Structure formats: C-alpha cells, structure tokens
Amino acid sequence: MSIRTPPRLLELAGRSLLRDQALAMSTLEELPTELFPPLFMEAFSRRRCEALKLMVQAWPFRRLPLRPLIKMPCLEAFQAVLDGLDALLTQGVHPRRWKLQVLDLQDVCENFWMVWSEAMAHGCFLNAKRNKKPVQDCPRMRGQQPLTVFVELWLKNRTLDEYLTCLLLWVKQRKDLLHLCCKKLKILGMPFRNIRSILKMVNLDCIQEVEVNCKWVLPILTQFTPYLGHMRNLQKLVLSHMDVSRYVSPEQKKEIVTQFTTQFLKLCCLQKLSMNSVSFLEGHLDQLLSCLKTSLKVLTITNCVLLESDLKHLSQCPSISQLKTLDLSGIRLTNYSLVPLQILLEKVAATLEYLDLDDCGIIDSQVNAILPALSRCFELNTFSFCGNPISMATLENLLSHTIILKNLCVELYPAPRESYDADGTLCWSRFPQIRAELMKRVRDLRHPKRILFCTDCCPDCGNRSFYDLEADQCCC
C-alpha cells in the first residue's frame, strides 16, 4: 500500500486561487513565480478560462511553451489563452510583471512543464530555474512586434485541425500586432488553394525546413514554386512523389522545370536536399544543380530515373564537394558507366560519412570502377550496398577495399548471387555455408563493428532478411 505525499502549503494555496471566481490581477502580481507553471497546467486541464486569461497577462517568463498542453482536448482553454494575449496586445498599460514575448507552439522535446511540476512536488525551485532553456528568438523580426508566435505547420488533411484553424484565424485578425514564425512546414496532403491561403499568412523568410510528400503533378508544383523562392533561409528541402502529368508536353515540362529550378538561385542557406520518386529530374538534373548557390551537406536522390548524362553533371557539380551524406538508392545504374560515380566519390572522399547505394542494380563488371575512390572515403561511418546482384568474388573484393576505413560503424552488403537458385529464390541449404565463408573472410580481414548481409526482398512479404553471425529464415 503506497502512501501519497500530502500537498505542500504553497500548492494548496495556489489551488484555492483557481477556485476563486473573482481572481484578480493584483493577486497574481504577488503570486510567487514558481507557482505559475504548475497552476497554469491545472487551470488549462480544468478549463479555468478566466484564470487562464489573467495568468497569461501576468506570465513571469518570456516564453510560454504551450504545445505540450494543447495535446489535451482543451480547445476552450486554448481560446482563453489567446483571449489573454489579446488583452496584452491591445491594452495600453501592461501588468507590472509582464514579460511574455514568445508563444511557442512548436512540437519539440520540452521539459519546461515537467521540471516545474517536479519542483512543486519536491520544493526544488532553484533547480527548476537552472534547468530553464534559453528563449528562442526569431532574428527576422526582432523588436518589431511585441509578440512572436512559433508554430510548426503540418498540413496532412483536407482541412486544418481545430487548434490550427483557431490560431490562424486569430493571427489573421492581428497580423500587425504579432509575428507568426514557422520554421518547419510539412505538406502531406491538402488542396493547394488551402495551402496558398496559409502560406500568405506566414513570413516565408522564417521557414528553414520544408517537406512536400503528397503526389503533386507538375502543374501543381508551378503554383508552389513562387513561394519556394521567398524562403531565403531554407536549410532543408524534401520533395517526394512528384510526377509529370501525361497532359504536359515536353516543351511545357522544360518550362516548368526551369521555373522551379531557378528558385534555387535564391536559396542561399540550403544545406540538405532530398528528392524521392521525382520523375521530372530525368534529363534535367543539370538545370537544378547549376542553380545551387551553396555547398550541400546532404544530397538524397532516390527511386528516380536518371540518365547517364545526369550522373555526369552530378559528378561535375561544385556544390557537392563537401557532402556528408549521399543517398542514391533506387537509381538504376546497371547499363551505365560508373566513372561519374567514381569521380563523385573522389570529390567527397574527405567529408563523406554516409553512403547508400542500395538497389542500384550494380553488377560485377561495374564495381571495380568505384573501389579506389571508395577506399579513400576515410570519414565514412555507414555504407549500404544492399540489393546489388554481385558474386561472391566481387563481394570479397569489395570487403577487402573497405578494410582500411577505420570509422566504418555500420556496413550492409547483399547476399552474393551464389546464394540463390536459378529462379531467384534464396537457397537455404546452400546459404549457411556461403554465410560462414563470408564471415570467416571478414574476420580474416578485420573486426567489424556492425556488418550485415541482406537477402533480396521476399516475394511473399516484401521484406529483406538481414543476418550477421546467424542466418534466420524469413519470418513469413
């Protein structure tokens, strides 16, 4: 039988304040700072709307991290917070202890509320003050508005959720009194007319990360393109499932791609570029690469169709010389010369830490072209080569070239062709012997930190089986 710790006197006093329907600002002016966070949480969860309005106006910190609290279904309480902010923004005289400058609705790992709750329980308010994180300001609008609202936009349904709808309507009516700062924008599915109305409310200069994954065709991309060009502080761009409509002529495609790629001339902070299943890149990668103004740290081009000329342009691009991550998985290279890939690896050898060449269809006759450059990537810590149909001899040769890469922590290689029957199914009677030979070869060469060999995708479940020292049959 557990014994509950009785509430502290301060805690009891604070709760009595919430029960007081006539709670006055003068009372809050004298309330100890350490009582505000736990009492605010209780007022929010109990929907004490009048108390919330007053507590927002007397909030003794520069920042109010509200996102963890609105995960509770309390739209009424959220509206009360906005009403309290209204009073701050419109009244001429502010409360004596007013400090609030930032309403933070970002979905980040935040222990503000937990720290102060534990402090209330244990009386360790000094530790709570020490554990406070510094306030994150928006450099774009410093000092121009009395309040900054940080928000992350995740547009995944046809309509906005009720909290975001409530917030955006409130912001729209007070746009001259506050600054709406969105650093992360994720578009996973919404009619573009709705997206457009939201983008018009946001200061595009503030956006640092954008992810678009909603099966757009080129005509829709053209509507998004002008907004992209205004995101001058964009650091990360992820595009996925962009298709060329069958109604778009080659001439129209070229014009649309040109309009899109020229926007990259304005993105002077871009460091991470990821494109997955983007069909318009075929034959046009040079247009995009020539418009890059910064040295990329991360480049991901996956499950796309590229021409051999696209690979050549990629190897010659000056903006990729400092890459830390290169992911070309799902790019079919079977019938291409890998000399451009060799040149590319030579360029990034001094900085490359992550290399993914899964499912590129690389065969025995192509591997030798990249081995000298690969063996000079001394910073490489992760290398994945699954899904490439190479023989046992070629795999052993590959392993002998990666032996000198001392920073390699994770290595993934395909099961050699000898592991399969003529119809392409894994031969479980032959496979254990091949695995044993491979592991012996690896141990003779070095002591890997983490090395896995993987099968082709199972025709029944679609998954790969990974194995190291033990070979387990597919779970299906």
UniProtKB/Swiss-Prot annotation:
Q: Where are the LRR repeats?
A: 97-124, 179-203, 204-230, 231-266, 267-292, 293-324, 325-345, 349-376, 377-401
Question: Can you tell me which family this protein belongs to?
Answer: Belongs to the PRAME family.
Write down what this protein is called. PRAME family member 5
Q: Which organism is it from?
A: Homo sapiens
Q: Which cysteines are joined by disulfide bonds?
A: none
GO BP terms, alphabetized: negative regulation of apoptotic process; negative regulation of cell differentiation; negative regulation of DNA-templated transcription; positive regulation of cell population proliferation; proteasome-mediated ubiquitin-dependent protein catabolic process
> What gene name is given for the protein in this entry?
PRAMEF5
The question of whether Repeat is a record keyword is answered with yes
Q: Which UniProt keywords apply?
A: Leucine-rich repeat, Repeat
Q: List the InterPro entries.
A: LRR_dom_sf, PRAME, PRAME_domain
Asked if Repeat is a keyword of the record, the answer is yes
The GO cellular component terms are: Cul2-RING ubiquitin ligase complex; cytoplasm
A GO molecular function term, named singly, is: ubiquitin-like ligase-substrate adaptor activity
